[in-house]
Amino acid sequence: INKNFFDDKLSLNATVGASINDIQEDAMYLKGGLEQIPNFFHYGNINVNTSKRNESKWHDQVQSVFASAELGWNHQLYLTVTGRNDWASQLAFTSKGSYFYPSVGLSWLVSESVKLPKAISYLKVRGSWAEVASSPNRYLTQMQYTYNEQTNTYEYPASHYNTNLKPENTKSWELGVNAKFLGNRINLDMTFYRS
């Protein structure tokens, strides 16, 4: 959405979307000494008496919906708000199967609002707050059997799974100034942030 209101004094830019990130692996690994032909690295040339097999099979999926909106006033003041919700397979079998993380930012183009000295071509101040979340590694919330190469069997896991696991959250904020001087010949970009 890209709309202007009140004789172009108020602007609205908005986006809504969804995504699926789906990653899978289904692999078998075979290692061992070579049988007859030197430097011929092929599974048919591996000595069956020394060979060891390992299998890996996993499937991760994150389903997401997201939205962002920017409200502008008189080409001077801008408010930006975003939000995203993820459903991650790594958090299956937990009470916290999905997680939401928002952000909000405010910027002011001072050079469009106030008469500044000629030496200052452009001046903008900005501030924002954001929260970011990420899911844990796979198999921490459900039982995983491990493959034993010596016995060629799957074994009961030594560690227990955690159904109370939650996503990792990071909150941060930042303040900044962008300035240009002497007809845009000198640029200054300063940011102070904390995470």
Where are these regions (language model features)?
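Extracellular/periplasmic, surface-exposed regions of secreted and cell-surface proteins
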Residues: 1-195
